[in-house]
Amino acid sequence: MLYPDVTFEEFARSIGVSLRAGLVAAFGPEAGIDAAAEALAYGWEHWARVGQMENPSGYLYRVGQTAARRARRPQGFLPIPPVDDLPDFEPRLLPALEALSEAQRVCVVMVHALGWGQTEVARLLDISPSTVRTHLARALTHLQRELEVNDHAD
């Protein structure tokens, strides 16, 4: 989608939350928020060029990925929260999510945890909806196997 007559501020208001959500899903809260800020700063600085791109939000997502990877710490992407702050959930879930590929993790978190549509996720990641479906299917198969979840619970 071209944004030739849209100011950067209008564009950022329309995609800022999506961009941040995708990068947080990929890299965790701290690195994802920082990466989104860097991506938006890059977009603001280069808006004359970025605004003419076919998918500027997808491009800025890639800018954010690069920023997050440069800053990535050696430990896992999810910080270990204090036990008292956690809702009840399967304790093996976080390690199982970390074991997914970045694309699979982003698709699962955005679709199943944040309630996004597959088309919205595809647009943000600059991939086809069928690729999102493939990532979801593979990720869910992996998670079911790791968490020993049966599709047909009695």
Question: Predicted segments — roles?
Answer:
Residues L23-A26, R92-L100:
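Short amphipathic alpha-helical boundary/capping segments
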Residues R70, P74-L97, G117, H152:
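Internal acidic/polar
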Residues Q65, L125-D154:
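DNA-recognition helix of helix-turn-helix
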